[in-house]
Amino acid sequence: MDVILLQRIKNLGKLGDKVSVKAGYGRNFLIPQGKAVAATEANTAAFEARRAELEKQESEVLSSAQARADQLNEVNIVITAKAGDEGKLFGSIGTRDIADALTNAGLAVDRAEVRLPNGALRHTGEFNIAIQLHHDVVAEVLVTIVSE
């Protein structure tokens, strides 16, 4: 089944690409979610008429993500947690804890945007945490974990 993508989809394509996908993936996921339309002649013509509008929306999303990244790059967060004598935490600091700390600091961040490639943080210290705001925009936040 051929579809025209209405937004960027990881490992598939970007806005306006005509791609071939399995029929079930197109019918049951891409089209109902509004991420693609079937590649008929009528839909192709309609997409070309809306292309400028869709590209403008995508550029606005990118610019707002870049503005948020500029704010986040200047932020240092301090999280207090119970820890043992050697700095090992009783528990861990995960994506939700970091997102909540950033939200309390006045910057709205969803926990899905926080990237912890090595898993939850289990020691006191300073950590550079990546915040993925857009597929092209990543911000770095310095998180300091101190014991109570």
UniProtKB/Swiss-Prot annotation:
One of its GO terms (biological process) is translation. Binds to the 23S rRNA. One of its GO terms (cellular component) is ribosome. This is Large ribosomal subunit protein bL9. It comes from Acinetobacter baylyi (strain ATCC 33305 / BD413 / ADP1). Transmembrane segments: none annotated. The lineage of its organism: Bacteria, Pseudomonadati, Pseudomonadota, Gammaproteobacteria, Moraxellales. Keywords: Ribonucleoprotein, Ribosomal protein, RNA-binding, rRNA-binding. Belongs to the bacterial ribosomal protein bL9 family. GO terms for molecular function: rRNA binding; structural constituent of ribosome.
